[in-house]
């Protein structure tokens, strides 16, 4: 008895900005054609990012790989044609146009681990660095400017030196409590 072929991850190129629609259409095509046994997950890898706009903290999603959809599948002529028939799919990445190559298990694991981490805590869209001047927009030091002393991306916190009555006072703040000065 032969072992069933293993589902591998393939990268499908889609029109930029249509990744979500392509993933949804692909899922619908798989169901419509009754080919669920040939396909696993269909992913558009994204992470949640937090940014400050007009003093408001906003969450949005950022794609890891704009223009690409990850598809877990068993590659054969039927599955290849199904993916290629989905509107706004440009083709597979890797291998040849008629014989696509899957990404390695190591690459797939790295992407899946990154997705897992991204779902735990939203990352800041804005990156800070020591020496940069920021404006505090929340808390007791609101409307004060300060200089970034330290950045802790793990905890999403900054140590900012705020000048109060002519004296530099170190203050620990969350990323959402400050905004960059342009």
From Swiss-Prot:
Keywords: Transcription, Transcription antitermination, Transcription regulation, Transcription termination
Keyword Magnesium: no
CDD domains: KOW_NusG, NGN_Bact_1
Keyword Zinc attached: no
Spans through the membrane: none
SS bond list: none
A GO BP annotation: transcription antitermination
Entries under InterPro entries matching the protein: KOW (IPR005824), NGN (IPR047050), NGN-like_dom (IPR006645), NGN_dom_sf (IPR036735), NusG-like (IPR043425), Rib_uL2_dom2 (IPR014722), Transcrpt_antiterm_NusG (IPR001062), Transcrpt_antiterm_NusG_bac_CS (IPR015869)
GO cellular component, one term: cytosol
HAMAP family named among the record's database cross-references: NusG
PANTHER family per the UniProt record, alphabetical: RHO-INTERACTING TRANSCRIPTION TERMINATION FACTOR NUSG, TRANSCRIPTION TERMINATION_ANTITERMINATION PROTEIN NUSG
Biological role stated in the UniProt entry: Participates in transcription elongation, termination and antitermination.
Protein name: Transcription termination/antitermination protein NusG
Organism: Vibrio parahaemolyticus serotype O3:K6 (strain RIMD 2210633)
